Design a protein with these regions (language model features):
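N-terminal secretory signal peptides that target proteins for export/translocation
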Residues: 1-11
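Bacterial N-terminal signal peptides
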Residues: 13-24
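Sec/Tat signal peptide C-region and signal peptidase I cleavage site
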Residues: 26-30
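Short, aromatic-enriched amphipathic alpha-helices that serve as compact interaction elements
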Residues: 31-47
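Short, well-ordered alpha-helical segments enriched in acidic and aromatic residues
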Residues: 47-58, 62
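A short gly/proline-enriched turn/hairpin at secondary-structure junctions
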Residues: 60-69, 85
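Surface-exposed, charged secondary-structure patches
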Residues: 73-119
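Short beta-strand edge/turn micro-motifs at domain boundaries
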Residues: 115-144
Length: 144
Protein backbone atom coordinates (compact mmCIF):
# COMPACT_ATOMS: atom_id res chain seq x y z
CA UNK A 1 0.00 0.00 0.00
CA UNK A 2 1.37 3.40 -0.93
CA UNK A 3 1.65 6.31 1.48
CA UNK A 4 -1.21 8.13 -0.24
CA UNK A 5 -3.50 5.10 -0.04
CA UNK A 6 -2.63 4.68 3.64
CA UNK A 7 -3.46 8.35 4.35
CA UNK A 8 -6.81 8.06 2.54
CA UNK A 9 -7.63 4.92 4.53
CA UNK A 10 -6.67 6.68 7.78
CA UNK A 11 -8.81 9.72 6.91
CA UNK A 12 -11.77 7.49 6.03
CA UNK A 13 -11.33 5.62 9.30
CA UNK A 14 -11.19 8.86 11.28
CA UNK A 15 -14.26 10.25 9.49
CA UNK A 16 -16.17 7.01 10.08
CA UNK A 17 -15.25 7.06 13.78
CA UNK A 18 -16.29 10.72 14.08
CA UNK A 19 -19.64 10.10 12.37
CA UNK A 20 -20.33 7.04 14.54
CA UNK A 21 -19.54 9.06 17.68
CA UNK A 22 -21.74 11.94 16.53
CA UNK A 23 -24.65 9.57 15.86
CA UNK A 24 -24.23 8.04 19.33
CA UNK A 25 -24.26 11.50 20.96
CA UNK A 26 -27.37 12.55 19.02
CA UNK A 27 -29.12 9.29 19.92
CA UNK A 28 -28.25 9.75 23.61
CA UNK A 29 -29.65 13.29 23.56
CA UNK A 30 -32.79 12.05 21.82
CA UNK A 31 -33.18 9.38 24.51
CA UNK A 32 -32.77 12.02 27.23
CA UNK A 33 -35.40 14.15 25.51
CA UNK A 34 -37.80 11.21 25.42
CA UNK A 35 -37.19 10.53 29.11
CA UNK A 36 -37.84 14.17 29.96
CA UNK A 37 -41.07 14.13 27.91
CA UNK A 38 -42.17 11.01 29.79
CA UNK A 39 -41.34 12.80 33.05
CA UNK A 40 -43.64 15.75 32.35
CA UNK A 41 -46.45 13.52 31.07
CA UNK A 42 -46.27 11.42 34.23
CA UNK A 43 -45.90 14.47 36.47
CA UNK A 44 -49.07 16.01 35.05
CA UNK A 45 -51.16 13.04 36.21
CA UNK A 46 -49.03 12.14 39.25
CA UNK A 47 -48.34 8.67 37.81
CA UNK A 48 -46.42 7.01 40.64
CA UNK A 49 -45.46 3.94 38.61
CA UNK A 50 -44.05 5.87 35.66
CA UNK A 51 -42.24 8.41 37.84
CA UNK A 52 -40.73 5.66 40.00
CA UNK A 53 -39.55 3.92 36.82
CA UNK A 54 -37.92 7.10 35.52
CA UNK A 55 -36.06 7.91 38.73
CA UNK A 56 -32.81 6.20 39.71
CA UNK A 57 -32.92 4.64 43.17
CA UNK A 58 -30.33 7.13 44.47
CA UNK A 59 -31.76 10.23 42.75
CA UNK A 60 -31.68 13.58 44.50
CA UNK A 61 -34.41 16.05 43.57
CA UNK A 62 -33.60 19.60 44.62
CA UNK A 63 -36.46 22.08 44.92
CA UNK A 64 -34.56 25.35 45.22
CA UNK A 65 -37.57 27.56 46.02
CA UNK A 66 -38.58 25.32 48.91
CA UNK A 67 -35.02 24.76 50.09
CA UNK A 68 -35.39 20.99 50.15
CA UNK A 69 -33.76 17.96 48.60
CA UNK A 70 -35.86 14.84 48.21
CA UNK A 71 -34.93 11.20 47.78
CA UNK A 72 -36.88 9.00 45.39
CA UNK A 73 -39.03 7.70 48.24
CA UNK A 74 -39.76 11.21 49.56
CA UNK A 75 -40.68 12.45 46.10
CA UNK A 76 -43.04 9.52 45.43
CA UNK A 77 -44.62 9.96 48.89
CA UNK A 78 -45.38 13.63 48.11
CA UNK A 79 -47.36 12.76 44.97
CA UNK A 80 -50.71 12.59 46.78
CA UNK A 81 -50.43 16.28 47.66
CA UNK A 82 -49.11 17.08 44.17
CA UNK A 83 -52.03 15.26 42.52
CA UNK A 84 -54.46 17.71 44.11
CA UNK A 85 -52.35 20.72 43.15
CA UNK A 86 -51.97 19.67 39.52
CA UNK A 87 -55.66 18.86 38.92
CA UNK A 88 -56.83 20.92 35.95
CA UNK A 89 -53.31 22.15 35.18
CA UNK A 90 -51.16 21.95 32.07
CA UNK A 91 -47.40 21.65 31.82
CA UNK A 92 -45.49 22.90 28.80
CA UNK A 93 -41.76 22.36 28.50
CA UNK A 94 -38.91 22.90 26.08
CA UNK A 95 -35.30 21.83 26.23
CA UNK A 96 -33.09 24.89 26.50
CA UNK A 97 -29.75 23.08 26.29
CA UNK A 98 -28.13 19.73 26.76
CA UNK A 99 -24.44 19.37 27.50
CA UNK A 100 -22.17 17.33 29.69
CA UNK A 101 -24.91 14.84 30.49
CA UNK A 102 -27.19 17.54 31.91
CA UNK A 103 -30.34 18.77 30.19
CA UNK A 104 -31.80 22.16 31.09
CA UNK A 105 -35.52 22.63 30.56
CA UNK A 106 -37.76 25.68 30.71
CA UNK A 107 -41.16 24.58 32.00
CA UNK A 108 -44.43 26.45 32.34
CA UNK A 109 -46.81 25.12 34.95
CA UNK A 110 -50.29 26.46 34.10
CA UNK A 111 -52.33 25.90 37.25
CA UNK A 112 -56.02 26.85 37.28
CA UNK A 113 -55.43 29.89 39.53
CA UNK A 114 -51.88 30.89 38.57
CA UNK A 115 -48.87 29.87 36.58
CA UNK A 116 -45.14 29.72 37.13
CA UNK A 117 -42.12 29.50 34.84
CA UNK A 118 -39.25 27.30 36.03
CA UNK A 119 -35.76 26.30 35.01
CA UNK A 120 -35.20 22.62 35.64
CA UNK A 121 -32.14 20.47 35.15
CA UNK A 122 -31.96 16.74 34.69
CA UNK A 123 -28.97 14.42 34.77
CA UNK A 124 -29.80 11.17 32.98
CA UNK A 125 -27.73 7.99 33.15
CA UNK A 126 -28.77 4.62 31.75
CA UNK A 127 -32.28 5.93 30.97
CA UNK A 128 -32.90 7.04 34.57
CA UNK A 129 -32.97 10.51 36.07
CA UNK A 130 -30.10 10.58 38.56
CA UNK A 131 -30.43 14.22 39.65
CA UNK A 132 -32.92 17.01 39.16
CA UNK A 133 -33.24 20.60 40.29
CA UNK A 134 -36.03 23.11 39.92
CA UNK A 135 -36.11 26.88 40.45
CA UNK A 136 -38.80 29.42 39.59
CA UNK A 137 -37.66 32.10 37.16
CA UNK A 138 -40.96 34.00 36.81
CA UNK A 139 -44.35 34.19 38.47
CA UNK A 140 -46.06 33.80 35.10
CA UNK A 141 -45.35 32.09 31.80
CA UNK A 142 -45.08 35.18 29.60
CA UNK A 143 -41.40 34.39 28.96
CA UNK A 144 -42.10 30.86 27.81
Amino acid sequence: MTGTARRVTNVRSAVFTFVALLIAIIAARADDGAIISRWYSALLVADRTELADLLADDVRIKLDDLGIVQSKQEFIAALDEWKGAVAGAAIRHRIAKSEGGVTTVIACYDFPDNDVLTRETFAVTDNHITASSQAAIAENCEGY
